Amino acid sequence: RNLLETARPLAHGHLVTVFGCGGDRDRTKRPLMGAMAARLSDRVILTSDNPRSEDPLEIIEEIKRGLVPPERPTARHGQPVPPVRSAAWASWPDRREAIERAIAEAEPGDLVLIAGKGHEKTQTVGDRVLPFDDVAVAREVLAARRKARVQVGGGGA
């Protein structure tokens, strides 16, 4: 929540949040994290974040329960009830693909927030520990995006 509230004013366009929840951890927090991301982001992209022994798709399904607000009354005591804000969302279980898509779809002024792994340099899937670095992937995708724009536009990024 604190990260999203801090990032929100930095986005001059949309706030796009890429995140997942770790496997073999507190399952009750997953829909709560989904709800918070949906409330404070304009777009949410769900992905893997160290699924460990759990199925990444099941983890994403649990997070998604918080993304869709439950049915609410339209009026209470004769007064309209304001709608619950809920972001558009997508899911890409492959973390690299999720980061690539978030950056590819970002418009000028948008802020892409890649949350969860931070300083970690690996992704744990089953009993395998695979090399994975959010920062390196984001830099690589941004460099490719800049290069493509220069080639298409013939000018600077």
Predicted features along the sequence, with ranges:
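ATP-dependent carboxylate-amine ligase
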Residues: 1-157
